[in-house]
Each structure stands twice: as C-alpha cells, then as structure tokens.
Regions:
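C-terminal, charged low-complexity interaction regions
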Residues: 134-253
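Internal, well-ordered alpha/beta segment that forms a basic, Gly-enriched binding/recognition surface
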Residues: 95-129
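Alpha-helix initiation and capping sites
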Residues: 68, 72-75, 101, 128-134, ...
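Histidine-centered nuclease catalytic patch
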Residues: 19-20, 40-76, 85-107
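Charged, low-complexity surface segments at secondary-structure and domain boundaries
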Residues: 2-16, 120-123, 140-154, 173-175
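Short, charged surface segments at domain edges that flank catalytic/cofactor-binding sites
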Residues: 1-37, 60-72, 190
Length: 253
C-alpha cells in the first residue's frame, strides 16, 4: 500500500480554499493530487473511482462522524475496497492508513494457493501489535479476498497477479538495459517508473527495485507518480523505505 501525501486543500485562482457542496466534487482534485488509483489496493482505475470518506460520515450510533465535505477526510477508492470498509469506525491507532503511516512497510503481496491470484498478507518481522494492526487493516479492506463467484465482482487478486508479471517483465528489461553498452541510467529508471504508473500496486515495484537507488528515486517522484509521501523514503540511503512516525516508540510505522 503506497504511503500518500495529498497536500492541503486546493485553492481557486484567488488563492482561496475551495469549498464544495457535494463530496464527489473533490474527485478531479484528488486525481490531480494522488493519481487515478485506489488508495488502499493501489489498482489503477479507468472509471468508477469512488470518493471515499476516510472517517465515515455515517458511522454506527455513538461514534462521531467524519466531516462530510472536508478535503482532509477525502480519498479515492475502488468499489471493493470502499464497500468492504463501509461505515466501520476508523482511527490510526487501529488501522494502517496511507496518509498517516508508511503503509508500504506492514504488508506484503504474495501468490495464493491458486497461482492466478495474489493477496495481501502481514509482512514478516512485525511485532505482535503491528501484526495485529496489519491483520485488522487487511480484514477491514478484504485485501486477502479471492472472489470465486461465477458472477465475479472483486478482481483485485487477479490484477495483483497481473502486476506481479509486469514487475517481473520490467526487471528483465532493466537487467538487459544495464548490460547494454548504450545504457542510459536516467532513461531506463524513468521508463521503469512509468511502467509502474501504468501498473499500480506500487509495493511490488518498491520490493523489486529496492536496491536500485535511481529507480527508487523515480518510483517516488511525484512528477511521474503523483501523491507519494516522499518523507517515507530516505534519499540519503538510496530511497529506502523508512518509518513515518519515528517519535511513536510503540509503532513508528
């Protein structure tokens, strides 16, 4: 799950914060800031991008609602992630959230027993509390779901597998390019990042190219892939993923 920074409330030509009367009116602004991806599963979407309230506007009785129209409470989601999340009360102490944590760190994408599908699991090496939080986030968004119904709706696991194949292909192209006497490092790294922009599922790309600093620089370049939280990657150390909340001793992720 890609860590995000969508920035402050957009402004109009006069520099005034934009105010909307319907939350869906944030859609184009969100696309301009973070791209056309579901913020949770990271699949790219050509249509049906849903504007989703991070903190539900209609939570269960007794739970404070999230702001119905505020920019700070808006993100983009696919139907399966948004429907799974529903009106569940949300806070950053219970779940890993892309604007609050380095959400690349607590999850891994792996093949299911059925190799046509890839699912999200808790990353190896988490402590007990982090593992539970990662598990709860996966459960909240059904990121380990495989839709086996004849009238399949949720194809996230199929798209993850397709992204895995894209990453493998990109790695082969990269290795051949590096071996070429005409190798241009900047051109090749930029090409890899543009492939990632088309593919989505960014954690797969970070994992594959983690030891290629120039590729990591391009993968986290907001001019190529909008909205990545650059403070979650260390430019002094080859753009390695780092904790977003280092002051939180219990869980710096």
């Amino acid at each position: 799950m890609r860590p995000l920074n969508k920035g402050n409330t957009p402004t109009d030509a006069g520099g005034n914060a934009i105010v909307v009367t319907a939350y869906r009116d944030w859609r184009n602004h969100l696309i301009n800031r973070i791209g056309y991806y579901c913020v949770y599963c990271n699949q790219p979407l050509s249509h049906s991008l849903q504007v989703e309230h991070v903190i539900p506007k209609n939570p269960p009785a007794g739970v404070a609602p999230g702001a119905a129209l505020d920019w700070d409470n808006m993100l983009l989601a696919c139907g399966p992630c948004n429907n799974a999340k529903g009106n569940t009360p949300i806070d950053a102490n219970t779940y890993y959230l892309p604007e609050e944590h380095n959400t690349h760190l607590p999850f891994s994408i792996v093949l299911n027993a059925n190799p046509d599908h890839a699912i999200v699991i808790e990353r190896v090496g988490l402590n007990v509390n982090q593992h539970q939080k990662a598990h709860d986030t996966i459960d909240l968004l059904e990121l380990d779901n495989i839709d086996a119904r004849p009238a399949i709706v949720d194809i996230r696991s199929l798209k993850r597998k397709a992204a895995m194949l894209s990453v493998q292909s990109a790695r082969q192209v990269y290795d051949m390019a590096v071996a070429s006497p005409t190798y241009n490092a900047n051109v090749v790294a930029t090409d890899i990042a543009r492939r990632a922009a088309d593919s989505g599922f960014f954690s797969l790309w970070y994992e594959e190219f983690i030891n290629e600093p120039l590729v990591m620089e391009k993968l986290t370049d907001n001019a190529i892939i909008k909205g990545t939280a650059t403070n979650c990657f260390d430019p002094a150390n080859g753009y390695q993923p780092i904790h977003r909340n280092p002051a939180n001793i219990a869980d710096p992720i």
